[in-house]
Amino acid sequence: MMKIAAVSMRIKQGRCEENVRQMMRCIEEAKQEGAQLIVFPQNAVSGLQLGEMWLDDDFCRYADSFNARIAALADTIAIVWGNVRYRGSRRFNTAFFAYRGQLELRVKKIDGALENEARYFDPLDIGELIEYGGELIALGFHDQLIPATLNITLDLSDRSISPRGASQLYVNGLSLLEDACGPKLSDGRCFCVRRGRLVHFSEHAQGCHYFDLDGAQTDRPQPVPLFRRMEMLVDALTDERGPFCLWQKHPESLRLARLLQSPELLEEAPMVYGTQNDDPAHPSLFSGFTLPQLIEAGIYDSLEEAGRTRLYADLYRRTRSLRGVCRELISMAGSSPVLQAELSDPQAFVQDLLARMIPLLRAYDELCLSEEYVRYLSDDLQSWLGRQDR
């Protein structure tokens, strides 16, 4: 029976030395706990959202230098981790497997998960299975699963996949990610499914998680409270970005400070974050939370209090299309006579929807919203809504 340590760690962007020190502590702890395999997330050494720093040869050479140091620690334990591999001015987003002088590499396919991914990294087709501890291991990223093997999946994103039938060990990092909408903290999810049985599941929990590969089936635990996730995000931002404050003209800022019992969030600081997902001028601390979650956490008392624009913005973030927004609203209309009445007049409804959404689409998605395209959207949505009534 193989004892495994799955590590969900706070990966700090660009701070290789600090990240590797954290990895070395985990490796030493796992050895003392008698684990045969320890698995770290994707880009555990360097972080992922580094932008143009990926084109800096000196940084990539520096980040790559840590791979040999980590591999040297794989004497009594096999180590899996993710980092850049730099050779001859080529950069490979790589998963590594090391054990007693054996070093195996798997290069992530260019799938667009990272903005400008094809600009920063090179492709390389390596796909042999790895034999270790009586297991055939398929080492990869996201949900590239191979049946009839143990799939070790590395991830470092704000999206994660769910347990499924194949034998799979999935490890995601707790990493701070940020875009035009605002900061998010990836979920740090670790799970292991063995022949259809869930033998481990954890999320939003930093550290080494130990379990036996062929252990007893376990139940998925209760979700981490939303206020705790907000608290973790605030801690991560403070740790990596330094002091910040909340935009006080957003009433939600006052509620969050009160919920977290952190009045210092309302004091003046060099950086300012908003708390409304429909205000492009202030990146929102809530960009990683859905509107129902914000209601559950007590930021809003109801959908009505949150307002129609925030509802539209939330639905668009989930569906990534205006048709998707309309589809969700149609499903909600049965419990909302007001919404039902508005949808009965497609032309007026679409005009209101576009008036609220166009500024957000320009600010967050940087779409080229010409007059011709806006007219197309209006005609398309009205036509689509008309077909739903038939």
Regions found by a protein language model. Give the residues of each.
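Enzyme catalytic cores with a strong preference for nitrogen-chemistry domains
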Residues: M1-R390
